[in-house]
Design a protein with these regions (language model features):
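OB/S1-fold single-stranded nucleic-acid-binding modules
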Residues: 1-14
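Short, Lys/Arg-enriched N-terminal segment that forms or immediately precedes the first helix
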Residues: 182-186
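Short amphipathic alpha-helical/adjacent loop interface patches that line ligand
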Residues: 109, 164, 197
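Basic/polar phosphate-binding segments, predominantly the helix-turn-helix DNA-binding elements
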Residues: 174, 199, 203-226
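N-terminal positioning helix adjacent to the helix-turn-helix/winged-helix DNA-binding module
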Residues: 137, 141, 189-200
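Amphipathic alpha-helical segments enriched in hydrophobic/aromatic residues interleaved with Lys/Arg
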Residues: 121-180
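N-terminal regulatory/effector-sensing and dimerization cores
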Residues: 11-127, 152-153, 157
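Alpha-helix N-cap/helix-start motif at coil-to-helix transitions, marked by capping-box chemistry
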Residues: 48, 106, 132-139, 194, ...
Length: 226
């Protein structure tokens, strides 16, 4: 089973000038969050090697935006709750006509592929680029992850990695290529599922003072991380 990587600065583009918040201190695996503010008229260009990017627009007022992605162009106002999906190795450029705030969610592309391999029994998965469109699930998940980083609670690591897994499955269901668009395979629970769940609950209660991870709990229950 491929374990998600911890995304360090070497994996990420340099965006410190507009950065307001980062999950670097959260010690998450498979996902990295950034919260940015960009002034009017700034232009961004980006190509990610081994990461998928979800950009969650949080600006309260509509803002005209011009985006170039994968050889296509779109010019329209973006609104709060819009999300655009930039897969790995896809060229992207944008310019805004006003100041904006947004959340960036970087996902480990190898981990997303591993989730697809286990859930869909397929290694021919391709996440497709999507211009901004409303996606309530990604929008709310982005806000939850941002709140988790701000809170720095004891369940921060487990919380973040669980939501990262949910985002990976959501991507495969709604933003993947034709070969990935079939329904996720249903996996029958093992006979010991209930006892495993109880063991996990007991373990969390006993170790509530620790920053537990999703990987640690999956190993405890001898269950797949996915």
């Amino acid at each position: 089973m491929l374990l998600p990587s911890k995304l360090t600065k070497s994996h990420l583009p340099d965006s410190t000038q507009s950065l307001l918040l980062s999950s670097q201190v959260a010690d998450w695996r498979g996902i990295h969050l950034e919260y940015h503010h960009k002034p009017k008229g700034e232009e961004n260009s980006l190509v990610l090697d081994q990461l998928h990017l979800l950009c969650v627009e949080t600006t309260q007022r509509p803002c005209d935006a011009h985006k170039w992605m994968d050889g296509r162009f779109q010019s329209r106002p973006i609104i709060q709750g819009d999300v655009f999906v930039l897969p790995k190795q896809v060229q992207f450029r944008e310019r805004f006509e006003g100041a904006i705030d947004y959340i960036l969610l970087y996902l480990d592309a190898d981990w997303v592929a591993a989730v697809a391999q286990e859930a869909l029994d397929s290694d021919h998965i391709e996440i497709l680029p999507h211009f901004p469109q409303p996606d309530p699930f990604i929008y709310q998940t982005g806000l939850l992850l941002k709140s988790a980083v701000e809170a720095k609670g004891s369940f921060n690591q487990l919380y973040g990695e669980t939501l990262a897994l949910a985002l990976s499955v959501h991507l495969l269901q709604h933003y993947a290529g034709r070969k990935a668009s079939r329904k996720l395979a249903s996996i029958a629970p093992a006979p010991s599922f209930s006892s495993n769940l109880a063991a996990i609950a007991d373990y969390i209660q006993i170790h509530c003072d620790r920053n537990l991870s999703l990987i640690e709990l999956a190993n405890l229950a001898q269950m797949s991380l996915y």
